[in-house]
């Protein structure tokens, strides 16, 4: 995108409000009790940790602090059924989803069952031909795969599995699970998505939405809990299955699914990143190499390097390629597979860029969509596998509910939708369900199918719901800034202190600061979507950078920025990543959010 277009389109973006926090005596007391700085105490309180004991546990995430897995409804029954499958060596089909949570969930359960001696078939449907979740078409192909694998062990083998475990899917598959029951195949569902209506029937369902507990575990976290429950039932399995060694897969799916890194998720990711750094699995070792991930992986490494490559095969082709990478024990296969995923991710970027440009072009012709609170765009020839990425881009730019639909030549559309805090996209789809073929997901992300002729009615229904239930405040971007800091404070001591709050991510954002009274020491330079500059404030100097920023939008004269500290591993120095900036108070320029 050229700078002129980027600058023009910036005028559509939502205004950003800076909300700067304030500390008090309670925060100072917390800092004293913990023996930390007032700033760290302030950041802990900002995250809701005002009790010294709770704050201490937050700073030191331990596996021993994980909640009892049997608190999850259905988990004991699911663990018992899995124990039966292990004892009887029943052929098990693990049926997953094609995103990184689904792939890592499938890999985790398949690896565990194989270690425990269970004959198992792993299957992930093709997005384009079979669609999301348990479908008759996908199940029938999976059963053929089971039959072939059983035939290898001897002729006359049973043509169906003894047990199906649906991971990261199944909650909305009421008819498909009923069909399995008719076929005499038992099923377990381990999923974190919301039901579209009534719950399906299965031997056991592990889904936090059943009892309203509000667990934010991704499906891979639920699979971990299932295996934890299994080990509690049968401690003898621990000799073959060392669950902590599988935490790299748990971190992968948890971060990739952008669930809040609080509670159990924080513990699982903190310990999982450590395990990921050990490069245990050949596939993850090879993928880290082609992705330029260092010896100490971070949440950003997973979110922006590993996860996109693992997602690429499912978006453009067949996610079984990513699953094979996570399951292989061969170094040569791993290196070949990682390189293939890297190439597909480059292809995915090109497709995404073209679709985003076309979507923005549609909005230029229909600017009223930006005032309705719901952006709904669709086109024939768009790639369904990239619709979710484009929806996320539009959400970040405009802070509106977004639905992006890819239609095929027959008018069948597959869409991805994104919500905002306070406006559940699943609820919006439920209200507009009369115009959809099917839908499912959770509050902030969902998928759906719609006929091309029904798109206008769907758009009107969703926009009407937003108008009735929404408020203008929901559609204003807000930056929660901890405090104002001088540029001279942006150094290694502060960075090291802030890292005590890591891992950062959804629900535990990297601390954001306002740096006032700045000017440019040298003109900005742009390359590959990244704008770099040197900031000055008095005698202090600091490198800074921002993504997706046109050089023509750089503010001349005095300005202030909202940003967070970043470690430049190559240059071995601290720099500031710019999130937003604006003229000094009294200036005429509006804020211009970058991220």
Q: Model-found features: residue ranges?
A:
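N-terminal amphipathic/basic leader segments beginning at the initiator methionine
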Residues: 2-22
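Hydrophobic helix-and-loop "lid/oligomerization" segment in the mid-to-C-terminal part
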Residues: 20-163, 183-184, 232-453, 457, ...
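Acidic, metal-coordinating catalytic cores used for nucleic-acid/nucleotide bond scission
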Residues: 99, 129-131, 166-172, 213, ...
């Amino acid at each position: 995108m050229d700078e002129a277009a980027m600058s023009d389109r910036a005028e559509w973006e939502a205004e950003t409000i800076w909300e700067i926090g304030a500390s008090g005596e309670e925060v100072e007391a917390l800092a004293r009790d913990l023996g930390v700085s007032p700033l760290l105490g302030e950041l802990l309180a900002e995250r809701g940790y005002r009790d010294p004991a709770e704050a201490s546990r937050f700073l030191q995430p331990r596996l021993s602090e994980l909640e009892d897995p049997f608190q999850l409804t259905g988990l004991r029954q699911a663990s018992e059924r899995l124990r039966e499958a292990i004892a009887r060596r029943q052929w098990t089909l693990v049926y997953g989803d094609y995103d990184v949570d689904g792939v890592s969930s499938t890999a985790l359960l398949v690896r565990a069952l194989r270690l425990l001696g269970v004959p198992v078939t792993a299957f992930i449907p093709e997005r384009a031909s079979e669609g999301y979740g348990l479908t008759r078409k996908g199940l029938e192909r999976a059963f053929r795969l089971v039959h072939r694998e059983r035939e290898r062990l001897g002729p006359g083998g049973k043509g169906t599995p003894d047990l199906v475990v649906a991971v990261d899917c199944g909650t909305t598959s009421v008819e498909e699970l009923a069909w399995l029951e008719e076929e005499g195949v038992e099923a377990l569902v381990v999923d974190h998505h919301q039901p579209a209506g009534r719950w399906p029937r299965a031997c056991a369902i592990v889904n936090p939405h059943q009892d309203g507990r509000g667990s934010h575990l991704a499906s891979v976290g639920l699979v971990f809990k299932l295996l934890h429950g299994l080990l509690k039932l049968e401690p003898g399995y621990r000799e073959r299955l060392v669950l902590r060694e599988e935490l790299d897969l748990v971190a992968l799916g948890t971060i990739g699914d952008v669930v809040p890194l609080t509670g159990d998720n924080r513990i699982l990711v903190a310990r999982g990143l450590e395990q990921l750094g050990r490069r245990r699995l050949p596939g993850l070792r090879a993928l880290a190499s082609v992705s330029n991930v260092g010896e100490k992986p971070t949440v950003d490494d997973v979110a922006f390097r590993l996860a996109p490559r693992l997602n690429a095969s499912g978006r453009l082709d067949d996610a079984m390629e990513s699953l094979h990478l996570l399951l292989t024990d061969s170094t040569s296969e791993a290196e070949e597979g990682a390189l293939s995923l890297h190439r597909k991710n480059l292809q995915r970027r090109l497709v995404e860029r073209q679709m985003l440009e076309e979507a923005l072009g549609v909005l230029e012709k229909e600017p009223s969509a930006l005032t309705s609170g719901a952006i709904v765009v669709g086109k024939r020839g768009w790639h369904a596998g990239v619709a979710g990425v484009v929806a996320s881009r539009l959400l970040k730019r405009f802070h509106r509910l977004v639905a992006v639909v890819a239609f095929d030549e027959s008018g069948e559309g597959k869409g991805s939708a994104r919500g905002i805090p306070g406006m559940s996209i699943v609820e919006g789809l439920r209200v507009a369900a009369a115009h959809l073929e099917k839908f499912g997901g959770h509050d902030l992300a969902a998928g759906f199918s719609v006929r091309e002729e029904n798109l206008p009615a769907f758009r009107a229904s969703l926009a009407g719901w937003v108008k009735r239930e929404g408020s203008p405040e929901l559609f204003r971007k807000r930056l929660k800034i901890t405090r104002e800091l001088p540029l001279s404070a942006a150094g290694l001591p502060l960075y090291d202190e802030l890292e005590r709050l890591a891992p950062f991510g959804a629900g535990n954002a990297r601390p954001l600061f306002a740096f006032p009274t700045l000017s440019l020491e040298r003109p900005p330079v742009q390359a590959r979507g990244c704008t770099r500059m040197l900031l000055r404030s008095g005698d202090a100097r600091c490198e800074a950078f921002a993504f997706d920023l046109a050089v023509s939008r750089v503010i001349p004269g005095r300005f202030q920025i909202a940003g967070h500290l970043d470690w430049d591993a190559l240059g071995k120095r601290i720099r500031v990543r710019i999130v937003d900036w604006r003229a000094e108070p009294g200036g005429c320029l509006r804020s211009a959010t970058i991220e």
